[in-house]
């Protein structure tokens, strides 16, 4: 197939050559500046129309020395997946510098709506774009809307607040992710009946709430012999998740499945069985003597150093994966497109859901 040349490949020099005028004259016509004879204006505009020429926004901004600043509001605390996103942002430094962009990360307690709203409010008038891992709460929603009203471009990252006036969401379809986790747990449990545990960070995080919703949909309709227990909220903290799950396992010896919706994975694994993490010599406070990791189907999220080890050791059965590098790059590209008034390439920025097991670890 023959390659199609796009009109944007043309430069001002090409238009000037075709119209028989100088570069300065073309620039004056493009920006409606005075001092150009009417017949010259007509000639330049005719050349532009014939070639469907569009000025290159990025080149024009670079020529004017236009710099932009973006802020990423991220969860504080040891969340391995969020740390991966931050690391990928750091790897983009050369790409960012070439476009006169700077990105800073702002760590905050995203489980505390007041703290998160305050972090967003502090950015008003201070940056061109904000990407935020958001809690779906009225105070956070109002803070997002205030940023938008102030002219800041806002993208929700990983966890959405669709009722706000944010400009775009970058992340997976979390209901579909939860349904996928439900299908995996149900099918891997097999013919057994029993109970299923869910550990989440917070149901106030929309990504966690949507995953739970999707998971419960599948459990209720496709696996009626499995009973889903009330959700434990571990705030993505290892110690809290371990304590909550440990108590639940002792109270319900017939648990056959576990869905870990967010982080806190090390605590969840410790509650299941210490010997799965023998290389770290962690203390099992819940069930080391029962070998529970061999009985409970364990599905979680994201491929990190820890989940990779758990998958290889057979403690974790599957991870629902989203590409943190893609999310970091997509969030920056979307913010830049919004700031420039350019179209968002939605298919390019769509974040896929992948199922990762021991046999297809990347």
Can you annotate each of these PLM segments?
Residues 1-66:
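N-terminal helix-turn-helix DNA-binding module of bacterial transcription factors
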Residues 55-118:
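Amphipathic helical "hinge" segments at domain boundaries
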Residues 75-83, 104-115, 136, 170-179, ...:
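Hinge/beta->alpha junction and helix N-cap segments in small-molecule ligand-binding domains
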Residues 129-130, 134-148, 215, 230-306:
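Hydrophobic alpha-helical
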Residues 138-176, 304-312:
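Flexible loop/hinge segments that line or gate small-molecule binding clefts
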Residues 177-197:
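A conserved helix-loop-strand patch within extracytoplasmic ligand-binding domains
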Residues 219, 323-362:
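Hinge/cleft segment of the Venus flytrap/periplasmic-binding protein
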């Amino acid at each position: 197939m023959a390659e199609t040349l796009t009109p944007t490949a043309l430069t001002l020099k090409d238009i000037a050559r075709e119209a028989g005028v100088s570069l300065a004259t073309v620039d004056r016509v493009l920006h409606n500046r005075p001092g150009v004879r009417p017949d010259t204006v007509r000639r330049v505009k005719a050349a532009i129309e014939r070639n469907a020429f569009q000025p290159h926004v990025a080149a024009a901004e670079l020529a004017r020395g236009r710099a932009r600043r973006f802020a990423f509001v991220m969860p504080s605390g040891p969340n391995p997946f969020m740390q991966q996103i931050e690391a990928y942002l750091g790897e983009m430094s050369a790409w960012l510098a070439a476009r006169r962009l700077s990105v800073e990360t702002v760590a905050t307690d995203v489980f505390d709506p007041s703290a998160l709203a305050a972090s967003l409010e502090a950015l008003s008038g201070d940056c061109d774009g904000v990407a935020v891992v958001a809690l779906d709460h009225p105070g956070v929603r109002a803070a997002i809307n205030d940023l938008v009203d102030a002219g800041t471009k806002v993208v929700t990252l990983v966890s959405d607040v669709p009722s706000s006036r944010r400009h775009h969401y970058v992340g997976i379809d979390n209901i579909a992710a939860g349904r996928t986790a439900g299908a995996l747990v149900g099918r891997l449990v097999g013919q057994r009946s029993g109970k299923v545990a869910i550990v989440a960070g917070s149901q106030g995080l929309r990504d966690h709430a949507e995953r739970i919703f999707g998971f419960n949909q599948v459990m209720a309709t496709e696996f009626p012999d499995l009973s889903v227990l009330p959700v434990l909220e571990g705030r993505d903290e290892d110690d809290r998740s371990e304590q909550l799950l440990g108590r639940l396992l002792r109270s319900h010896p017939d648990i056959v499945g576990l869905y870990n919706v967010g982080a806190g994975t090390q605590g969840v694994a410790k509650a299941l069985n210490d010997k799965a993490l023998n290389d770290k010599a962690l203390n099992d406070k819940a069930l080391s003597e029962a070998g529970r990791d061999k009985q409970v189907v364990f599905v979680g999220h994201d491929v990190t150093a820890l989940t990779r080890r758990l998958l290889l050791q057979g403690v974790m059965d599957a991870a629902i994966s989203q590409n943190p590098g893609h999310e970091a790059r997509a969030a920056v590209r979307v913010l830049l497109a919004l700031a420039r008034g350019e179209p968002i390439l939605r298919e390019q920025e769509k974040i896929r859901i992948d199922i990762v097991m021991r046999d297809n670890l990347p």
